[in-house]
From Swiss-Prot:
Name of protein: Chaperone protein DnaK
S-S bridge residues: none
Species per Swiss-Prot/TrEMBL record: Natronomonas pharaonis (strain ATCC 35678 / DSM 2160 / CIP 103997 / JCM 8858 / NBRC 14720 / NCIMB 2260 / Gabara) (Halobacterium pharaonis)
Positions with biased composition (Basic and acidic residues): 492-513
Signal peptide range in chain numbering: none
Region annotated Disordered, chain positions: 488-532, 579-656
Pfam family, one: HSP70
Function comment: Acts as a chaperone.
Extent of Gly residues compositional bias: 584-635
PANTHER family named in the record: HEAT SHOCK PROTEIN 70KDA
Amino acid sequence: MASNKILGIDLGTTNSAFAVMEGGDPEIIVNSEGERTTPSVVAFTDDGERLVGKPAKNQAVQNPEDTIQSIKRHMGEDDYTVEVGDDEYTPEQISAMILQKIKRDAEEYLGDDIEKAVITVPAYFNDRQRQATKDAGEIAGFEVERIVNEPTAAAMAYGLDDESDQTVLVYDLGGGTFDVSILDLGGGVYEVVATNGDNDLGGDDWDEAIIDYLADSFEEEHGIDLREDRQALQRLHEAAEEAKIELSSRKETNINLPFIAATDEGPLNLEESISRAKFESLTSDLVERTVGPTEQALDDAGYSKGDIDEVILVGGSTRMPMVQEKVEELTGQEPKKNVNPDEAVGLGAAIQGGVLSGDVDDIVLLDVTPLSLGIEVKGGLFERLIDKNTTIPTEASKVFTTAADNQTSVNIRVFQGEREIAEENELLGAFQLTGIPPAPAGTPQIEVTFNIDENGIVNVEAEDQGSGNKEDITIEGGVGLSDEEIEEMQEEAEKHAEEDEKRRERIEARNEAESTLQRAETLLDENEDAVDDDLRADIEASMDDLREVVEDEDADTDELTEATEALAEALQEIGKQMYQQQAGEGGAGAGAGAAGGMGGAGPGGMGGAGPGGMGGAGPGGMGGAGPGAGAGQQGDGEEFVDADFEDVDDEDDEDE
C-alpha cells in the first residue's frame, strides 16, 4: 500500500539524510545500517554486486577504482560519465542509486510504499543541475513533488519564532557546495530575499588540503607521490576526513598509516601529527572564499549585518571552529546551534513535503532564482527577462522583432548569468521558431515568454503573433555551468561591469545607427514625391556620413551617436513637411504611416528597431524620426524577434 506521505531528502555531496512528518513534526529516518545519515557513495564489486552508503564507503580502500564519491559535484554535466568495467553511468544514474537505497530504507521504516519526495539542492544550483536532480529522483522511482533550496529548507527546520518578523542568514557549508541565503520570516511565511554561493567549495576541499600536505611531506622524505597510487590515495582521503573531524574538537590529531608504500628496502609508514593551528593555516584560503558570497548576498538583499536577527549554520563542515569564527566575524553574532547541521536540510525538506501533502498548513515558502535569465539579442547582448533573486514561480514576457527583411525563422538562444554580453553567460539551450510570414524587417511580432516553476526549472516559449506559430523548450539536463563558472560568475560580472557597459553602449549605438539608416531609406522610397530635392539631398548626405561611420569598425559610441542624431534631425523635416501637407489637405491621416506613426503610432511608435526601446520616437513624439526608429508600419504594433532579437519599448504603447 502506498503511503500519502512525502519523503524529504537531503541529497548531499558526502552524506544524505531523509525525513518524514510524524505526528506534526519532522523526523529523521534511520537507515538500514541504523544510522541517521547515509554516505553518498556507490561501489561496484568484482562479482557484480552494487553497494550503496556505508557498505560502499567501508570497502573504498580495497576497491578505489570502482567506488564513486561526491558525484553531486558533476550533476548536470552532459559529457561526464563514470566508467565501471564495460559500463558507463551518468551522475544522474549514480545519484539515483543513492536515492533508491533511501527509498527502500524509508519504506522499510514506515511499512508502506513511498512514491513522492521533496529533494533539496544547493541554492546556487543552475537550471541544468536542478533538472538533473529531478531526473535522478524519477530514475529512482519517485514522483519529485518539489526541488527546494537547501538553506531555505534548513531555515524551516530550525523552528524559528513564527509570531515575530525576523531576518535570517543561513550559512550552508556542506561536503561539496557552499550557499548563503537571506530570508525574511514572519507569520509562517519564509521569503528568500537573496542567495549566493560557490558550487565548488565544501568539506572535500578541506580534506584535499590535508591530503596534499601529507602527500607532499611524504614525497619530500621518501621520493614517492602517494597520490599516484589509487589505493594509497583512498587511505589518505579517509585519514584526512577523520583528522578534519577530530580537529573540530581537539587541538591536535595523529595520523598513522602503516605500509602505505614500499621500496626495495621494505615497507614505508606514514606518521604525522597535525595541530589545529596548522590545519587552519593550510585551509585559511578556503574559509575566506565564503566571505565574498556572504557579503554579496547581504548587498543584494539591501541589508547590513546589523539587520540580521538570527544566523543558522547548516552542513557538517560548519562544525569546524574556524568556520564558526568566520561566520561570527561576518555577521556580528553567534550562530544558532539547536539543530544538528547534518540533519537540518532533510528535516526542512520533510516540512515542505508536509506543506504539499496538507499535513502542514501554516507555512508558505517563497524561494528565488539565483541567476538572471534571458536571451541573446542584436549585437550579441544579453537581454534579461527575469532578474536574479526573483521570487519563484514566476513568468515574464517581452516582444521582439526581426532585423532582416523577409526573415521566416528565428533562433532563440537562452542564457543564464549576470554578464552584459550573452556569450559570456551560460548557454542553457536554443530552439528555432519557423513559419514566420515574409515581411520587412521590424514587422513581425514575436513574443518570448520565460516561465520558472516552483522547482526553479525553466520553460521558454516563442510565438509569432501574426501567424500563431509557436515553439517552446524546457531546459533539460545537459552540460550546465561548470563549478568554476558558477563560482566566478558574480565576481566576473562585477569585475567586467564597466567594460561590459561600454560594449553594450557601443553595440546599441551601432544598432540604432543601422536602424535609422533603414528607416531613412524606407521614408525616401515611400515618399518620393513628398520630399523636395533640397531636403532629399540633405538626408542622403547625412545617410552617407552615417554609413561611413557604421562601416568603420573602430568608430566609438560618440561618433556613432553624433552621426545618427544628424540623420535623425534631417528625417524630422520629412515629418514636418508631411504634417504641413496634411494640414493643408484637411486629412490628418494621409501620410501618418510613412511619417513614422506620428502622434498615434501603434505600439513601439514606428516599431523602432534599435535595442533598448524599439519605437524610437523622436522629439515631440514624431515616431520614427529619432534614433532607433525602425522599419515597422504605423499602427501595426511593436517590433519583434529574430536571431538578432531587437527589444520593444512598451512605453510607446501609452501613446496610442
